[in-house]
Design a protein with these regions (language model features):
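Active-site metal-binding motif and surrounding structural segment of the metallo-beta-lactamase
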Residues: 40-96, 194
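Active-site neighborhood of phospho(di)ester-bond hydrolases with catalytic His/Asp-centered motifs
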Residues: 34-38, 55-63, 103, 176-180, ...
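A short alpha->loop->secondary-structure connector
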Residues: 53, 82, 117-129
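Structured loop/turn residues at beta-strand edges in well-structured enzyme cores
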Residues: 50-53, 96, 124-126, 142-144, ...
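Binuclear metal-ion centers of metallo-dependent hydrolases, dominated by the metallo-beta-lactamase
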Residues: 185-197, 205-263
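Core dinuclear metal-dependent hydrolase active-site scaffold
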Residues: 1-50, 128-187, 257-263
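Extended hydrophobic secondary-structure segments that form protein cores and membrane-embedded regions
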Residues: 60, 90-105, 129-132
Length: 263
């Protein structure tokens, strides 16, 4: 079973009560894997019962602030809890490697420099393996395989230097597609076929248009999960959900902060 928790369901809008910037995680066999790290993601996760010390990897779709604004604080909280839990925390994290996949390593270098100016110079007893995202397989462990597929949400300044990616995750016999921010749902090909969950966004799209895209293409899929939602959806939640269900039936979730579900 894969357990999902939504830490932030909001697009990069100005602050909206009860809706933080985009972040969610998957728990597989006791390990935690993150998709994006928007503001306050560690705070939300911890208070929602997610074990931060079980973090194995963090996958960033692209380096906009609404997707990385909480990244430094996430690592800070992991270190903090390592000490709060004393001997148990130290033992759990000793020699552990946390993987970070992010297309713009400059962002990570800046965040790390900031962390090194905090308590104890950010001395840690675990390793952070930061590597760039590129097309193809970017991560593999005993629980999952993750492949990246570039999209044109961010246009490269240099040919081929893509900074925005969608992810396909195979875990526990399931297929999950995380679109991230995307200009055109068609641009990453037929990766959606056979997916059990497809995380889609309405920060740049309308609910009915997204649903109709998948219906018209005829993809076989389990459920659409709307994250990175704009004000139109957040302010009109029930109406948006009704619209989606009128098109795809019960095969839809419009996420809210703190929401949990399993696959």
């Amino acid at each position: 079973m894969i357990n999902f928790t939504i830490h932030g369901s909001c697009a990069g809008t100005s602050p909206i009560p009860g809706a933080r910037h985009t972040s969610y995680c998957m728990e597989v066999n006791g390990s935690v894997y993150w998709i994006d790290a928007g503001e306050n993601c560690a705070y939300s996760a911890h208070l929602n019962g997610v074990d931060l010390l079980a973090t194995r990897a963090i996958f960033i779709t692209h380096p906009h602030m609404d997707h990385i604004g909480g990244l430094g604080n996430l690592f800070w909280n992991i270190r903090k809890l390592t000490y709060v839990y004393k001997d148990e925390g130290m033992a759990r994290m000793e020699g552990k490697t946390l993987s970070l996949r992010i297309s713009e390593l400059r962002s990570w270098h800046g965040i790390y420099e900031m962390l090194c100016c905090t308590e104890g110079d950010f001395g840690i007893n675990f390793t952070i393996d930061a590597a760039p995202v590129m097309d193809g397989e970017i991560f593999r462990d005993e629980n999952m395989v993750v492949t990246a597929h570039h999209n044109s949400h961010l246009i490269p300044k240099t040919e081929g230097d893509w900074k925005s990616y969608s992810f396909v995750i195979h875990a526990d016999g399931k297929k999950i597609v995380c679109c991230g921010d995307i200009r055109d749902y068609a641009e990453i090909g037929d990766v959606y076929e056979g997916a059990d969950l497809i995380f889609v966004e309405t920060g740049h799209h309308k609910v009915d248009a997204v649903c109709n895209f998948f219906l018209e293409k005829g993809y076989n899929f389990g459920k659409l999960v709307f994250v990175h939602n704009g004000r139109r959806v957040i302010d009109n939640y029930e109406e948006s959900l009704e619209t989606a269900k009128s098109l795809v039936g019960d095969r839809v979730i419009i996420s809210r902060d703190g929401m949990k579900f399993s696959l």
